[in-house]
């Protein structure tokens, strides 16, 4: 498995390009589709699809510009992708209406060699993606190296976030964590 990391947009959103035996996909195409496509070309891969850890604008802004037919996201996150009131695009001076076909994911689904973990709280349909063999967790805005996602946006729920963090805390702790913002944490260990 190969992975490249890009930090994009006003908020320094972490965007990841992952290539494995299932194909190549982008996690959270924050903005600037051309930068993402150039990085994929440097990797020698053609991006097959997009997956969104959640539907906030700083994670979806380039989703419709990558020339792909569909995006994958949790079934409870579709309203954020489609509705600028919920995806917060107005805060960035835009009005983003998702235009791609949505493939709806659920907790426990397999996606391109990863397991989907539903982690509501920051948003209703937030997800993490976990690959046990590679010990990789893409945590979106659920969990960061030094904190967790905010819950004061529409659809946020602190009690749900606490449950999601507890779910992640029960996992094996020696995974590499790739969050939606900030530093990547290699070999996470419980303290």
Predicted regions and their residues:
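Core dinuclear metal-dependent hydrolase active-site scaffold
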Residues: 3, 17-19, 107-131
